Regions:
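Buried, small/hydrophobic-residue-enriched core segments of structured protein domains
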Residues: 3, 8-9, 15-24, 33-36, ...
Length: 222
């Protein structure tokens, strides 16, 4: 009454549904993970009780709200994976694991934790690299899959990390060298360098750290 107006909604059918004790519906759906063209319905809801013809329509928004976002993210991930597969086939000589080619970094830009988990879950169908680390145990538990087979996170710096270390060191070289030799000597990591003079890092600082880079047991992504 307070939301839609007094007497607009008849609450008696809701009470009858509660008394019935179950949802009298039948749901049919495409197999999970199936790829279909635009315009193909993914699921259908049918009422199975003559007194509750209104129920499928009432449930449609709830189900659609839960499904559309991970489906879109899975489709985007699959589209990128097709591009990766095409150009890896053209340019790579060895059998590189293509599932490691790209990662998603949308965690902070999502509408909340639940949305971030859904987005990364869709992404992890095509790639293993994700910055939404909570999605890895989430998918592992949901699909009863070993967590090591779902995906992995990566060590990545942040702009504030680079800036605060510049403030402490007084230069751009010291912290990069520290990451290579002290913090992550045996771990691949991503280094956010656009907080610094990016081209100075690429053209001057990194060449000065050539020996440290070659001795580093892993990849440094700039």
């Amino acid at each position: 009454n307070s939301c839609l107006g007094a007497g607009v909604v008849d609450c008696e059918p809701i009470g009858k549904l509660h008394d019935l004790g179950y949802l009298p519906i039948e749901i049919v759906a495409l197999p999970e993970g199936m790829k279909v063209p635009m315009g193909c319905p993914c699921f259908g809801i049918t009422n199975t009780h003559p007194d509750f013809a209104w129920l499928p329509q009432a449930l449609e928004s709830l189900i659609s709200a839960e499904l559309w976002y991970p489906m879109i993210c899975a489709t985007v991930g699959h589209t990128y994976r097709k591009i990766v597969d095409k150009y890896y086939e053209l340019t790579c000589d060895d059998n590189i694991d293509r599932s490691r080619a790209l990662g998603n970094f949308d965690f902070r830009g999502d509408q909340g934790l639940d949305a971030a988990l859904k987005a990364a879950s869709g992404w992890l169908l095509s790639f293993k690299n994700t910055a939404t680390v909570p999605a890895i145990p989430f998918v592992s538990e949901h699909f009863n899959t070993p967590i090591t087979e779902v995906g992995f996170g990566a060590v990545s710096t942040e702009h504030f990390v680079m800036c605060s270390n510049y403030a402490a060191d007084g230069d751009e070289k010291t912290f990069i060298k520290k990451m290579l030799t002290e913090l992550y000597p045996d771990t691949s990591f991503s280094c956010v360098c656009d907080s610094y003079d990016y081209w100075n890092v690429v053209e001057n600082i990194l060449p000065e750290l050539k020996e440290e880079i070659l001795a580093h047991n892993g990849c440094m992504l700039v």
